[in-house]
From Swiss-Prot:
Name of the top EC class for this enzyme: translocase
Gene behind this protein: ndhC
GO biological process, one term: photosynthesis, light reaction
Keyword NAD: yes
Quaternary structure note: NDH is composed of at least 16 different subunits, 5 of which are encoded in the nucleus.
Cell location: Plastid, Chloroplast thylakoid membrane
Key word Zinc-finger present: no
Keywords, in A-Z order: Chloroplast, Membrane, NAD, NADP, Plastid, Plastoquinone, Quinone, Thylakoid, Translocase, Transmembrane, Transmembrane helix, Transport
TM region positions: 7-27, 64-84, 88-108
Protein's name according to its UniProt entry: NAD(P)H-quinone oxidoreductase subunit 3, chloroplastic
Molecular-function GO terms, alphabetical: NADH dehydrogenase (ubiquinone) activity; quinone binding
Length: 120
């Protein structure tokens, strides 16, 4: 009887999860019709042909909100395992997590005072 070594399951999972997207893209590429032409290069907006120049630049104001969200989302990723093993890790880990949260709060206050969270 063959027993899996410690990493055999990992390598099987990795190879299957790599093979599935490769197969999906290969099948799509071989079966999908390829049509190149001027029609592919035109912009399409709700079935209406654009009038005038269609390239405009505009300021994206959501990036700072997204950046602050990502910071606090990463904070959650770090704090969740700590909270689940709080009783095992002890006081030193609590102090480390507390300092981590304080640094993030200082960063939030800094972003708030700089106007990063203002819409205008």
């Amino acid at each position: 009887m063959y027993l899996f070594s410690e990493y055999d399951t990992f390598w099987i999972y990795l190879s299957i999860s790599s093979l599935i997207p490769i197969l999906a893209f290969s099948i799509s590429r071989s079966l999908a019709p390829i049509s190149k032409g001027a029609e592919k290069a035109t912009s399409y907006e709700s079935g209406i042909e654009p009038m005038g120049d269609t390239w405009i630049q505009f300021r994206i104001r959501y990036y700072m909100f997204a950046l602050v969200f990502v910071v606090f989302d990463v904070e959650t990723v770090f704090l969740y395992p700590w909270a689940m093993s709080f009783d095992i890790l002890g006081l030193f880990t609590f102090i480390e997590a507390f300092i981590f949260v304080i640094i993030l709060i200082v960063g939030l206050v800094y972003a708030w005072r700089k106007g990063a969270l203002e819409w205008s």
